[in-house]
From Swiss-Prot:
Swiss-Prot/TrEMBL GO biological process terms: arginyl-tRNA aminoacylation
Enzyme Commission number(s) from the entry: 6.1.1.19
Subunit relationships: Monomer.
NCBIfam families: argS
Cellular location(s): Cytoplasm
GO MF assignments: arginine-tRNA ligase activity; ATP binding
Major localization listed first in the record, in broad terms: cytoplasm
SUPFAM superfamilies for the chain: Anticodon-binding domain of a subclass of class I aminoacyl-tRNA synthetases (SSF47323), Arginyl-tRNA synthetase (ArgRS), N-terminal 'additional' domain (SSF55190), Nucleotidylyl transferase (SSF52374)
UniProt-recorded name of the protein: Arginine--tRNA ligase
Aminoacyl-tRNA synthetase keyword on record: yes
Length: 563
């Protein structure tokens, strides 16, 4: 039970009109620590009690009598709780030094499955910064859900089917060079893709030719299939090299093509349930009763199935294969209407588990305020960006610690961590402007800043040769250490909030606050000096390091021991 839960429990025993859950939601953290650690506003009770909030607050403060609090006082309409710093710091430090990286582990998920649809780059196109968001958000959510007791299944739903393959085949047959493609597959295929899109704007016959080649591909034409397979294989080699560098793994690479033979079954179910309507030669599902104006287009007039038909097949396959408790789609917010339709059609089909599907949208990455586009060749490629971030990190590490032994390894962890952290600290639904210099800075709210705080603590612990005792009696009651204790105590709740909101930025912002609080503590406190508090200060440093490292791990970011 954390402090807020304890206060809510105590208050619920003397307030008849509010239950513990309602009280918990009303509790606030005062801006000024002189007003206590936690405050309960009495306004909501005024109407029921028919008394002024100030009077209610005074009565509640009078009735509170718990040894967990240093004091409880009424200040105007608020009941302010001052916590017993020594007792709580002892509990928190005991918990972290005993449980170590398992501190804040929970079993909310009871080992049920969470399927995470993430990354999903398009075959034969380079892996750009645009794909990074889905990849790192999905990977972080996987760590977060595992932390609270779920098993996760990470699915890379590759864009390995569609008219763009008709475009690529036409471009390759017209202008492609087999040796050049073998040497630099993605670069060459991107050039071909950009060129045919540019030329098709002036020559509509290229579009028709591409459609024809895609029809051949759908019908199993040998040449079309061989080229498609080659484009796919070459792309996957490149993608996997990047995933290895990012330290992101997947449980399934079943992409769009995997569902080619599973869509007719979906159309049959819709037909049997009488859900398909004819509209201008096409077959659709009406979704007006769900407040969705446009019907879901299942089959075009030429018999071709659509994106939503494929996603329906994927949803049915995943439910059958994984029996998921949650199915999460980490896909850009421009797809919001599509996922509303997907859930509504599944509901119409009678599948209650459609409620377990969640679209986790995210904002765009821009460069100097401009939208990025592969088609127009205006794109930030991930591989050279990672190399540049690692190079910049190495320059700063050499300046700070020229004697460091494994500079390359540390620069790699810092450079890649910087890119991931910058993305994840941004509220998911907001976009951000790509700025490598800001990302790799050791100052400000960045990954390197948090990593450096962790490495600094490790240096302190090495100097002290500190090993925490499981039965150690550690406690502190000064203001600076109290700020850190409150944050560490809050870590389990922070993880729950991040999971409930599918929002890794909650953990990134927590990591920044904890690093800042420790740096402030370090500036004011002589941790290594001989004093009665020395062991407790070292235990606090140790606990901070444990929680910082775990917060970074939940974001998919490494924590180097030395920097």
């Amino acid at each position: 039970m954390n402090t807020k839960e304890l206060i809510a429990s105590e208050l619920s025993s003397i307030i008849d009109s509010l239950d513990q859950e309602a009280i918990l939601k009303l509790l606030e953290t005062p801006k000024n620590s002189e007003m206590g650690d936690i405050a309960f506003p009495a306004f909501s009770l005024a109407k029921v009690e028919r008394k002024a909030p100030q009077m209610i607050a005074a009565e509640l403060a009078e009735k509170m009598n718990s040894q967990a609090f240093e004091k409880v006082v009424a200040t105007g309409p608020y009941v302010n709780f001052f916590l017993d710093k020594s007792a709580i710091s002892a509990q928190v430090l005991q918990a972290v030094t005993t449980e170590k990286e398992h501190y804040a582990d929970q079993n909310i998920g009871k080992q049920e499955n969470v399927v995470i649809d993430m990354s999903s780059p398009n075959i034969a196109k380079p892996f750009s910064i645009g794909h990074l968001r889905s990849t790192v958000i999905g990977d972080s959510l996987s760590h977060i859900f595992q932390k609270i007791g779920y098993q996760t299944v990470k699915v890379n739903h590759l864009g390995d089917w569609g008219k763009q393959f008709g475009m690529l085949i036409v471009a390759y047959k017209k202008w492609g060079d087999e040796e050049a493609v073998k040497a630099h597959p993605i670069d060459e295929l991107l050039k071909l893709y950009v060129r045919i899109n540019a030329e098709a704007e002036n020559d509509p016959s290229l579009d028709e030719e591409a459609r024809e080649w895609f029809r051949k591909l759908e019908n199993g034409d040998e040449e079309a299939l061989a080229l498609w397979q080659w484009f796919r294989d070459e792309s996957l080699v490149e993608f996997n090299r990047l995933y290895n560098e990012l330290k992101v793994e997947f449980d399934s690479y079943n992409g769009e093509a995997f569902y080619n033979d599973k869509m007719d079954a979906v159309v049959d179910i819709l037909s049997e349930k009488g859900l398909l309507l004819e509209s201008e030669g096409a077959q659709v599902v009406n979704l007006e009763k769900y407040g969705i104006e446009h019907p879901a287009l299942i089959k075009k007039s030429d018999g071709a199935t659509l994106y939503i038909t494929r996603d329906l097949a994927a949803a049915l396959y995943r439910k059958n294969e994984y029996q998921f408790a949650k199915s999460i789609y980490v896909v850009g917010q421009e797809q919001s209407a599509h996922f509303k339709q997907l859930k509504a059609v599944l509901q119409e089909m009678g599948y209650d588990w459609s409620d377990d599907i969640t679209h986790v949208p995210f904002g765009l990455v821009t460069k100097e305020g401009k939208k990025l586009s592969t088609r127009k060749g205006n794109v930030i490629l991930l591989e050279p960006t990672v190399a540049e971030a690692v190079s910049r990190a190495k320059v700063q590490i050499e300046a700070k610690n020229p004697e460091l032994e494994n500079k390359d390894q540390v620069a790699h962890a810092v450079g890649i961590g910087a890119i991931k952290f910058y993305d994840l600290k941004t509220d998911r639904t907001n976009g951000y402007d790509f700025d490598l210099e800001a990302m790799v800075s050791f100052e400000g709210e960045t990954g390197p800043y948090v990593q450096y705080a962790y490495a600094r603590i490790q240096s302190i612990l090495r100097k002290a040769d500190f090993k925490p005792e499981t039965a150690g009696n550690y406690s502190l009651n000064d203001t600076e250490s109290w700020e850190i204790i409150k944050l560490i105590q809050d870590f389990p709740r922070i993880i729950n909030r991040a999971a409930d909101n599918f929002e890794p930025s909650i953990i990134a912002k927590f990591a920044i606050s904890l690093a800042q609080s420790f740096n402030k503590y370090y500036a004011h406190t002589r941790i290594l000096d001989e004093s009665p508090e020395r062991d407790s200060r070292l235990a606090l440093s140790y606990a901070t390091a444990v929680v910082l490292k775990e917060a970074l791990r939940l974001l998919g970011v490494e924590a180097p021991e030395k920097m």
